[in-house]
Amino acid sequence: MGGCAGSRRRLLDSEEEETAPEPRPPRSYHKGALWKNVMGFWLLGLCNNFSYVVMLSAAHDILSHQRASGNQSHVDPDPPPTAHNSSSRFDCNSVSTAAVLLADILPTLIIKLLAPLGLHLLPYSPRVLVSGICAAGSFILVAFSHSVGTSLCGVVLASISSGVGEVTFLSLTAFYPRAVISWWSSGTGGAGLMGALSYLGLTQAGLSPQHTLLSMLGIPALMLASYFFLLTSPEPQDPGGEEEAETSARQPLIDSETPESKPDSSSNLSLQERWTVFKGLLWYIVPLVLVYFAEYFINQGLFELLFFRNTSLNHAQQYRWYQMLYQAGVFVSRSSLHCCRIRFTWVLALLQCLNLAFLLVDVWFSFLPSIYLVFLIILYEGLLGGAAYVNTFHNIALETSDQHREFAMAAACISDTLGISLSGLLALPLHDFLCHLS
């Protein structure tokens, strides 16, 4: 059905209206609508995470340089080394890039903590508008910033955009075929790769970072267009076929205590039901927290300390390459659900923690002889993180009832954000400790 009409008729914008469950449609889901929806969710994933990734890619530059006079950005493509701790054996900024990470994640954490309690009462369209406006505001504020403090305010706007968007769109997947989850995950991985690569490529090519950030204003507009004009109205879905067989073979996360029914949203779940569902989700939430804690401790705590002086890349360029390779790994693994499915995500958490331990030892002893070995490890780190994300949400979608799925997807969003927040809090004192070593 048409995009505008679909938006006006969207079931989700009238969540407070109780309607009788409609009959299930035939198993042959309309191919045109299916492709519009999966492409819509891919674009939503891409656009939702784009500003978040760009801010992390620019973290080293944001903390290294203030805006110069005139119309030039405070971030230079190849900045001279300033405000570093010259007494340390590391090439350190005075403030860890974890500060940007915290500005980019703490607002998201607050949003995700509060979302299961009341965000579902707000229709979806206003949430999407808030997300798009905040994303655009983040690019504008950082582009025209004269100080680190103002830039961090722009980073906070990017965090609000990403947090509201992720909770909104993952909850929205409950009303569409389960295939949209893998497409959403692939889109978020694509945001990482395209965001990091675009910032790296445009600044390396000599484009003013101010103009680079302003050129990205088309991304929030694309997100709004994808939601309002590309997605079709959600309809009751019949798992059917392979998905039905796979679901029936799984152990449900919680025992169903209510008669079989499929309400249009989870807004009528009691607090007791929400707590019961959340406890069942811990089997998947805890491993994902560990995965994201380890990888973002590496990314924002160790990346700037993994500095090789015997290469043609300066410190800022090395940091950008690290971010780009990590995001490339995330994109590949978040797009791999159709090829490889992992139920026991604890294995991924263990491997990522081993990754952290190995790189932490290298920061201390500097035994890796080449930056290219670090490149490979960072690519592998991204593969683990992306696989953990997509498989966690896929497993939750399979193992929760239709009645609980919308709430479960929104509640599980806290996993990555909590892990990232903890890593940022611990990376700050580690940075200060290591950078004061003579």
Curated annotation (Swiss-Prot):
Xref: InterPro entries: Battenin_disease_Cln3, Battenin_disease_Cln3_subgr, MFS_trans_sf
Lineage of the organism: Eukaryota, Metazoa, Chordata, Craniata, Vertebrata
Propeptide position ranges: 436-438
Keyword Transcription: no
Record-level GO BP terms: amyloid precursor protein catabolic process; autophagosome-lysosome fusion; glycerophospholipid biosynthetic process; glycolipid transport; Golgi to lysosome transport; intracellular water homeostasis; L-arginine transmembrane transport; learning or memory
Modified residues (Cysteine methyl ester): C435
Cytoplasmic topology ranges: 1-37, 149-151, 204-277, 368-438
Renumbered residue ranges of the record's region Disordered: 1-29, 68-89, 236-267
Name of protein: Battenin
Subunit and partners: Interacts with DCTN1, KIF3A, RAB7A and RILP. Interacts with CLN5.
Primary role: Mediates microtubule-dependent, anterograde transport connecting the Golgi network, endosomes, autophagosomes, lysosomes and plasma membrane, and participates in several cellular processes such as regulation of lysosomal pH, lysosome protein degradation, receptor-mediated endocytosis, autophagy, transport of proteins and lipids from the TGN, apoptosis and synaptic transmission.
Gene Ontology MF: a single term: glycolipid binding
Subcellular compartments: Lysosome membrane; Late endosome; Lysosome
Short sequence motif Lysosomal targeting motif. Required for AP1G1, AP2A2 and AP3D1 interaction: positions: 253-254
Positions where lipid (S-farnesyl cysteine) attaches: C435
Entry-listed glycosylation sites: N71, N85, N310
